[in-house]
Amino acid sequence: MRLAIINGEFKDKISIFDRGLAYGDGFFETTAWRFSKRKKDCRVEFWNRHLRRIKQTCQFLNIKISNFSQLEKDKKKILTKAHNIGMVEGVLKIIITRGEGGRGYKYEKNMKPNIMFIVSNKTEYPSDFYSNGVKIKISKSSITINNSLAGFKHLNRLDSVLARSEWEDHDVFDSMFIDNYNNIIEGTMSNLFFIKENVLHTPSINVCGIKGIMREVVIDKCSEFFDEIKICESSKDFFLEADSIFLTNSLIKILPVKQVESKKFVIDQRVLKIIKKFDDLKFLELK
């Protein structure tokens, strides 16, 4: 099941002249939503954090959205429709492009952005992924170094597309990028955390990678389980000496890792406690 709204209207086609198609000139957000029985409406997990990042990315890319309250209206409109046709939870993807324009990289001032909301079914991961962990690999593909774009979820995702084409093994959940300096960065679709001697480490996202919302949530709300949370460069060798590893994104939340290539890892009980936090609706900052 999929629904789409473009600029406030239910439709699923855009112009071939859209700069998002021609140049990747735009960005996207992906998050989860659910129907709240208590509130009697549909709510998005960590919505205010996603909305803040939308505003920050618009400012950085100089994409002019005149009225951000329209995003709230579009969100409500598409989720209400989704619930009316029987959905009680799912995935919400928001794509914002600079809009339609002529040839060439230079964009016109005051272009009208195209704002797309897409609702689709939630992917159900096996419960043993969360109790027993998943396998991951190290990518053979490089990740693009770009200090200016680091952290932003822009539409140029060919790094992940090429890396994801490297494996067909259904037992492998994701593949980790290594930069040109042999530092571990992130997965094709996830951020990365690892525990070493009671310290939680996550790679810095200063020259490449995405600063994911779930990465932010763990840093902000899970410090109680560790002596320290370090955001720093981490070599591949240092990472492979970790005591325990987990992945994050807005759909999987927290996913323990049991194996990297041929090396096996234990699942720290603190990771399981963090997973339990997501059962608390207040923790999800629903809005």
Give the residues covered by each predicted segment.
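Helix-start/capping segments and mature chain N-termini
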Residues: 1-66, 73-77, 102-287
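Ordered, amphipathic secondary-structure segments that act as subunit-interaction surfaces
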Residues: 79-96, 103
